[in-house]
Amino acid sequence: MPNSTSQVTKLKSKNNEFSYTADAVSIYLHKIGRVPLLSHEQEIFFAQQVQQMMVMFTAKEELAEKLQREPTLQEWADKMQLKEDVLLQQLSQGQIAKQKMIQANLRLVVSIAKKYQKRNLEFLDLIQEGALGLERGVEKFDPTLGYKFSTYAYWWIRQGITRAIAQQSRTIRLPIHMADKLNKIKCVQRELSQKLGYIAGVTEIAQALNLEPSQIREYLQLVRQPVSLDMRIGFEQDTQLQDLLKDDGMSPERYAERELLYQDIHNLLAKLTPQQKEVLILRFGLAGGCELTLVQISQRMGISRERVRQVEKQALTLLRRYGIDSRSYLAD
């Protein structure tokens, strides 16, 4: 009979864990919700400062490559044709502007992360990866192109989240290009299913993506996740998965019998001539290979089929002289 106290304890533990996660998310959402959105003019102003900072970092990297060492502050300032204090001031302004753009757009990160929940990554982890993508978007954004930053940042945030899912949520990591292909297949499958009114099959997906059905099946095989044999299952969580799986492997007793049999066969074959030994090995697959016909053996050994038959008969007759019934071994 299940232990009710144990069940209650486990349920409380799970509820406490869920409550902690939910509280952390609530606190985070409340915190970022207090940050005001930027106006279009502010986006342009801060983006220009960030771009100026990125130009400085690029110049520093070029200088380091040329000098084959880390440049001094004076060398860096000379490269930018600025005084040291002006260089430091513009770097500081760039960092502040970058943080303002990131903080003002974290709600966009949360909005995108919600679409990727239940992908084997915690919600807060999705947000963190999306924030890293947002940071990259801030560094790359060119305000002179005229579009809103949120439109540009959306792609970077989404890429950060999807790549993290591809790299971290699987026991066996998939290459990025394969993960992207899987996401494309899933997206097309959803669209086709909505359009057709039933779950789209492999052939329909393949036609939509201009691929062969075999390619789609190969990609879909990669979606399968490995499962730990130590995973606990059941209501009480007191049974391991491996305890319920049939072991098709050889038992220790059977393994010992087989090894003794191999040793006996080796001793038997040692009593034969090299030609007789080779014929029996090939004829009965004693070396772990397939059993060959008389014709196949004759072709391999370069002798006639009749000669192979004679050698086989001689070998078996010789073994019987030693009082050994070879059929019991060869049948095994």
Curated annotation (Swiss-Prot):
GO MF terms held by the record: DNA binding; sigma factor activity
Record keywords: DNA-binding, Plasmid, Sigma factor, Transcription, Transcription regulation
Stored InterPro entries: RNA_pol_sigma-70_dom (IPR014284), RNA_pol_sigma70 (IPR000943), RNA_pol_sigma70_r1_2 (IPR009042), RNA_pol_sigma70_r2 (IPR007627), RNA_pol_sigma70_r3 (IPR007624), RNA_pol_sigma70_r4 (IPR007630), RNA_pol_sigma_r2 (IPR013325), RNA_pol_sigma_r3/r4-like (IPR013324)
CDD domains assigned to the protein according to its UniProt record, in alphabetical order: Sigma70_r4 (cd06171)
Annotated region of DNA binding: 294-313
Key word DNA-binding present: yes
One of the GO biological process terms: DNA-templated transcription initiation
The UniProt record lists the keyword Cytoplasm: no
Residue ranges annotated as motif Polymerase core binding: 125-138
NCBIfam families in the cross-refs: Sig70-cyanoRpoD, sigma70-ECF
Family from the record: Belongs to the sigma-70 factor family.
Protein known as: RNA polymerase sigma-B factor
Species, as recorded: Nostoc sp. (strain PCC 7120 / SAG 25.82 / UTEX 2576)
Taxonomic classification: Bacteria, Bacillati, Cyanobacteriota, Cyanophyceae, Nostocales
